[in-house]
Each structure stands twice: as structure tokens, then as C-alpha cells.
UniProtKB/Swiss-Prot annotation:
Domain of life (superkingdom): Bacteria
A GO MF term: carbohydrate derivative binding
Enzyme class, broadest EC rank: lyase
Annotated catalysed reactions: N-acetyl-D-muramate 6-phosphate + H2O = N-acetyl-D-glucosamine 6-phosphate + (R)-lactate
Role according to the record: Specifically catalyzes the cleavage of the D-lactyl ether substituent of MurNAc 6-phosphate, producing GlcNAc 6-phosphate and D-lactate.
Name assigned to this protein: N-acetylmuramic acid 6-phosphate etherase
Family: Belongs to the GCKR-like family. MurNAc-6-P etherase subfamily.
Pfam families linked to this entry: GKRP_SIS_N
UniProt pathway annotation: Amino-sugar metabolism; N-acetylmuramate degradation
Entry EC number(s): 4.2.1.126
Subunit structure: Homodimer.
């Protein structure tokens, strides 16, 4: 049994002992100062984040999935990051998946006891038909959530890659993952409230993992999200701007190719850059494994 009082995320913050006596302005300054520490803490963890991204790219190239698992705030952040990959990078909802202890209901309300079940984490991956091509990333600010540990142990059993993300050093979940990430943000502004600095650190790291792994499989050209899915009016206009930025064409030219490409931004860009029709552009992209740059050779 882990003594929770020894965890950094459970310790009291010396800077905020008199929090209830501060003015709103004083509390804001203190909270902002604490938040400033997060990016520097994440910077210290960069060497351990890199192999997780490399593993995610490898998983995608083999047809595997990136699966986030967590409870409470940690689980919600995983679900959020996974959901954003669909419109941003044009991947199917089955490629990056967020699982939260207690299921969809736990996104909005607490599901008692769910995070304390080793078996539930295991069962959720069984239900997902986890295979050896997948990467499972267990997220737990405390670093000791049984739901996450059960999932990581099952993933290792079947030969899937495993990674963990904790906001405590020497975390228990680090012992259960091939690629552990530990980020020390110090005690929380409000004692034990890991939705604060810990949650911010987790979101920054998940942003890195999903975004840079997508770059690694050709979802980005220069710094443009060329596989964006235009699911609303704002994204339709953004898609046209992306085509213009990538090719230096006019708005009218971008709109024309966007329509010819059946609203496929990447295809429209290739059509303009290589002066080809839609079908030839599709062939070029297949040969280039989806990388726009490789269609220009």
C-alpha cells in the first residue's frame, strides 16, 4: 500500500498556506506563478517523452493504435486529446482512443470505485481487442491508479508497447511501463487538486505526443495541418487558407482545387504543387506514404 502523504502531488504548497486569506488579486498572482513552473517541469521530461512519440509513430505505421487510459481528470484529458485528433489530422476515431475508468459516464460525473479496479483496466483493453501493434499510455497524476496499472500489465502480457505519464517521481506506474514519463511540478496551488498543475502538465505532454506523432506519419506539411477535415463552415474556410498558404495560390484557385479534390486539403495541395489532376494526385500520395513533401521529388 502506497503512503499517499509522501507523494509530491499530495503535499501542501508552502507558497499558499494562507490561501483563504488572500485577495483575489493575490491569489491570481500566486496561481499564475505556480502555473509558470509547469512548462519548465515538462522540459525536464522531454528525453523521456521522445521515445513514446517514436513508439506511437511505429504503432501507426504498423496499423496499430495509440490508446490513452486514465481515471478522473487524467482520463478526461486523454479522451479530449484523442477526440481532437479526428478533425485536426483526419484520422479515424479508432486510431487514437481515450479510455476513462467508469466509461463515458465518468466524463461528467464520478464513478465510485472505478479507478481502484485492476481488473477494469484489463477488461477495457480486452473489449477493445488490444493487439501487439498498439501502444497503451497510462495516465495517472498520482502514479498509482490501479485501473491504469491493470491496463498496463495486460498490455505487456500480450506484447503491446506500454508508456506511462505521472506527476510524481519514482511513481508506481513507471514500474509497469516500458516508456515511463515522470514530471515533477511540485505541490499543487490547492493541496491535492491535481486537475491544476498536474492536469496542465499532462495536457502539454499529450499535445506533444499526439501532434508530433502525427507529423511523423505525414499529417503535416511545413507547419500546416493538411489532413484537417472541413466539418463546419469555419474549417471549410481554414482549409482554403491552408491550400493558399501551402501553394501561394489565390483564394479562387484554392477553392477550385478544393472542390475538385472533394474537399481533401492534402490532395488539393498536391494537385496545385505538381500540376496534376485529382486521380494522379491520389496516386502520388499513395506512393509518398501520405507525405506531401515526398510527392514533389
Amino acid at each position: 500500500m502506497i503512503d499517499l502523504s509522501t507523494l509530491t502531488t499530495e503535499r501542501r504548497n508552502n507558497e499558499t498556506f494562507n490561501l483563504d486569506q488572500m485577495t483575489v488579486a493575490e491569489a491570481l498572482i500566486k496561481m499564475n506563478n505556480e502555473d509558470k513552473k509547469v512548462a519548465f517541469a515538462v522540459e525536464e521530461a522531454l528525453p523521456n517523452i521522445e521515445p513514446v512519440i517514436s513508439s506511437a509513430i511505429e504503432a501507426f505505421n504498423k496499423g496499430g493504435r495509440l490508446i490513452y487510459m486514465g481515471a478522473g481528470t487524467s482520463g478526461r484529458l486523454g479522451v479530449l486529446d484523442a477526440a481532437e485528433c479526428v478533425p485536426t489530422f483526419g484520422v479515424p476515431a479508432t486510431q487514437v482512443i481515450g479510455l476513462i475508468a467508469g466509461g463515458d459516464k465518468a466524463m461528467t460525473v464520478s464513478v465510485e470505485g472505478a479507478e481502484d479496479s485492476l481488473e477494469l483496466g484489463r477488461q477495457d483493453l480486452i473489449d477493445l481487442k488490444l493487439n501487439e501493434n498498439d501502444l497503451v499510455l497510462g495516465i495517472a497524476a498520482s502514479g498509482r491508479t490501479p485501473y491504469v496499472i491493470g491496463a498496463l500489465d495486460y498490455a505487456k502480457e500480450i506484447g503491446a508497447k506500454t508508456a506511462s505519464l505521472s506527476c510524481n517521481l519514482n511513481a508506481e506506474i513507471s514500474k509497469h511501463a516500458e516508456f515511463p514519463i515522470e514530471v515533477d511540478c511540485g505541490p499543487e496551488f490547492l493541496t491535492g487538486s491535481t486537475r491544476l498543475k498536474s492536469g496542465t502538465a499532462q495536457k502539454l505532454i499529450l499535445n506533444m505526443i499526439s501532434t508530433i506523432s502525427m507529423i511523423g506519419i505525414g499529417k503535416v506539411y511545413n507547419n500546416l495541418m493538411v489532413d484537417v477535415k472541413p466539418t463546419n463552415e469555419k474549417l471549410v474556410e481554414r482549409s482554403k487558407r491552408i491550400i493558399m498558404q501551402a501553394t501561394d495560390c489565390t483564394y479562387e484557385e484554392a477553392e477550385e482545387k478544393f472542390i475538385e479534390a472533394d474537399q481533401d486539403v492534402k490532395l488539393a495541395i498536391v494537385m496545385l504543387l505538381t500540376d496534376c489532376a485529382a486521380e494522379e494526385g491520389k496516386t502520388k500520395l499513395v506512393r509518398a506514404n501520405g507525405f506531401v513533401k515526398n510527392t514533389l521529388n
